[in-house]
């Protein structure tokens, strides 16, 4: 088997024109099938009918994709990496002599190519959605017209490198091809600049589908015209392809319920469905169901905003039942109910601010979070309930401040029963002990001493204080870590005139605490008195 490449095919002007026609047919297989069926049936069919794709997404194309211009400034470079030419095994085993078969791996490089396409898209997506929705859930709109946008896309400076696998059997009259390791780069320009970035991202993701399905199909269809010799085989191949297209065509969406099925449905379910449909077709502020906050779970309707706010935890809401019951028994209207704001007032407040829910919530938190006077007078309040309500209001306000100002408020927390870690253990044991009052009495023989005072510079006030202290000294109460004296004048006298005091004064001064007695005995010179040793931290 031999083959050759004719470079003149790529250099001729007809190559770009034929490639443009093939790409246009490959990009619009659905419209081509519609036109063929319309010609066969004898009636014209709208080729721009909107249908859903097999993936479930809406088809926004209102017209065919027309390839306006294709230009290969440079001839594509084709490099054969592997080639296997032989006879088919199935044909040899059947005794038919075999058919020519070729398998090869090639590297394709394209540089400097340009492609320009144009189409018309539908921008009213609501019209496309309602075209496929059942009638019993489709609302009635005042206007739902089409809004078409023509768009032109230009791909310039296309650079592509890919590894392709080619499979050819002469008897099958076609070439099978697949692409692997595709590297593609291009410059994109769109007539609608606001959509250019979005379309470019989606096109780059759609290139995988282009090289896996669209381009191999176009090359296969093109190869059929090259290797088909008889009209019979061409018509049979065309018939097989049309049959395959009809089987692969996505079926139109079907209505779930028919007239016979509606009779078997529950009347209660149909009533709920009709109520749901009617609620979606009205702009009234009055709810269709007064006992519920919202017909749709997780959503809050505007007309039910007041009932939602009235159920928020607050002191007035919690004790309103108590006050209302008391007013009903007394035969007078409730003052608390008269103080509640109207719905119009809440709507005016919500329209003046950006967040209607937070604005109305702030009103109830600040204006209506009041404890009724009747509850205070009759002591009908509960401190635990009031604390719980105030905590919820505080946490709600702090959450709102944290979302708006991005600052977390500080809150003082007191923990009971927590020991201090930095305090020594032996000090805690000492503080738990009760202070002990002790008295030491020393008996010594009394002798009248001779006191000689050479000079006296003391004032009269000091003399009177000294005489009163010496005549009736007081016992000193002390603990293990602190020592108190009853007079600074006594300490001054003992330090300055300790050697000049008589024996009676010495005996009276000895009736003090054990810790103070150690210091006082040292000052008075009573070293023979046995005293306990001082504590380690004294």
From Swiss-Prot:
Cross-referenced PROSITE patterns: SMP (PS51847)
Record's subcellular location: Mitochondrion outer membrane
GO cellular component: ERMES complex; mitochondrial outer membrane
Keyword annotations from UniProtKB, A to Z: Lipid transport, Lipid-binding, Membrane, Mitochondrion, Mitochondrion outer membrane, Transmembrane, Transmembrane beta strand, Transport
Segments crossing the lipid bilayer: none
Domain (SMP-LTD): residue spans on this chain: 1-224
Disordered: region residues: 26-55, 231-251
One annotated GO biological process: phospholipid transport
Presence of keyword S-adenosyl-L-methionine: no
Topology in membrane: Multi-pass membrane protein
InterPro entries associated with the record: Mdm34 (IPR027536), SMP_LBD (IPR031468)
MF terms in GO: lipid binding
Quaternary structure annotation from Swiss-Prot or TrEMBL: Component of the ER-mitochondria encounter structure (ERMES) or MDM complex, composed of MMM1, MDM10, MDM12 and MDM34.
Domain statement: Lacks alpha-helical transmembrane segments, suggesting that it resides in the membrane via beta-sheet conformations similar to those predicted for other outer membrane proteins and porin.
Family: Belongs to the MDM34 family.
Role description: Component of the ERMES/MDM complex, which serves as a molecular tether to connect the endoplasmic reticulum (ER) and mitochondria. Components of this complex are involved in the control of mitochondrial shape and protein biogenesis, and function in nonvesicular lipid trafficking between the ER and mitochondria. MDM34 is required for the interaction of the ER-resident membrane protein MMM1 and the outer mitochondrial membrane-resident beta-barrel protein MDM10.
Name of the protein in question: Mitochondrial distribution and morphology protein 34
Organism: Candida glabrata (strain ATCC 2001 / BCRC 20586 / JCM 3761 / NBRC 0622 / NRRL Y-65 / CBS 138) (Yeast)
Lineage: Eukaryota, Fungi, Dikarya, Ascomycota, Saccharomycotina
């Amino acid at each position: 088997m031999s083959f050759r490449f004719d470079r003149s095919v790529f250099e001729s002007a007809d190559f770009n024109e034929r490639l443009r026609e093939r790409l246009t047919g490959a990009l619009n297989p659905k419209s081509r099938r519609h036109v063929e069926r319309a010609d066969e049936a004898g009636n014209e069919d709208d080729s721009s009918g909107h249908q859903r794709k097999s993936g479930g997404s809406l088809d926004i194309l209102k017209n065919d994709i027309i390839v306006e211009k294709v230009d290969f400034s440079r001839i594509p470079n084709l490099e054969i990496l592997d080639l296997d030419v032989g006879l088919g095994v199935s044909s040899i085993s059947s005794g038919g002599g075999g058919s020519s078969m070729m398998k090869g791996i090639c590297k394709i490089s394209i540089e400097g190519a340009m492609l320009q396409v144009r189409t018309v898209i539908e921008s009213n997506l609501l019209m496309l959605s309602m075209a496929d929705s059942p009638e019993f859930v489709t609302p009635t709109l005042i206007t739902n017209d089409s809004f078409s946008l023509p768009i032109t896309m230009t791909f310039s400076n296309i650079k592509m490198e890919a590894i392709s696998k080619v499979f050819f059997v002469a008897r099958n009259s076609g070439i099978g091809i697949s692409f692997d390791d595709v590297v593609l780069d291009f410059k994109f320009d769109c007539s609608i600049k606001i959509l250019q970035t979005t379309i470019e991202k989606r096109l780059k993701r759609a290139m995988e589908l282009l090289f896996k399905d669209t381009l191999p199909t176009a090359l296969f269809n093109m190869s059929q015209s090259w290797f088909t010799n008889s009209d019979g085989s061409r018509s049979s191949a065309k018939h097989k392809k049309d049959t395959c297209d009809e089987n692969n065509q996505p079926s139109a969406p079907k209505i779930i319920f028919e007239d016979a099925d509606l009779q078997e449905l529950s009347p209660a379910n149909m009533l709920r469905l009709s109520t749901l449909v009617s609620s979606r077709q009205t702009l009234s502020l009055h709810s269709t169901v007064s006992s519920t906050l919202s017909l749709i779970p997780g959503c809050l309707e505007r007309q039910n905003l007041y009932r939602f706010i009235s159920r928020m935890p607050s002191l007035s809401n919690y004790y309103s039942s108590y006050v209302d019951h008391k007013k009903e028994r007394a035969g007078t209207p409730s003052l608390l109910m008269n103080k509640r704001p109207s719905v119009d007032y809440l709507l005016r407040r919500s329209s003046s601010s950006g967040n209607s829910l937070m604005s109305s919530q702030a009103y109830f938190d600040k204006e209506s979070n009041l404890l009724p006077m009747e509850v205070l007078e009759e002591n009908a309040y509960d401190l635990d309930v009031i604390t719980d309500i105030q905590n919820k209001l505080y946490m709600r306000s702090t959450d709102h401040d944290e979302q708006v100002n991005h600052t977390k408020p500080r809150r003082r927390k007191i923990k009971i029963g927590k020991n201090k870690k930095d305090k020594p253990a032996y000090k805690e044991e000492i503080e738990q002990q009760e202070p002990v009052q002790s008295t030491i009495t020393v008996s010594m023989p009394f002798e009248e001493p001779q006191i000689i005072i050479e000079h006296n510079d003391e004032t009269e006030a000091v003399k009177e204080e000294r005489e009163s202290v010496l005549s009736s000294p007081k016992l000193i109460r002390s603990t293990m870590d602190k020592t108190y004296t009853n007079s600074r004048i006594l300490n001054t006298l003992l330090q300055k005139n300790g050697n000049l005091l008589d024996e009676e004064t010495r005996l009276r001064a000895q009736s003090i605490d054990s810790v103070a007695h150690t210091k006082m005995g040292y000052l008075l010179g009573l070293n023979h008195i046995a005293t306990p040793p001082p504590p380690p931290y004294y």
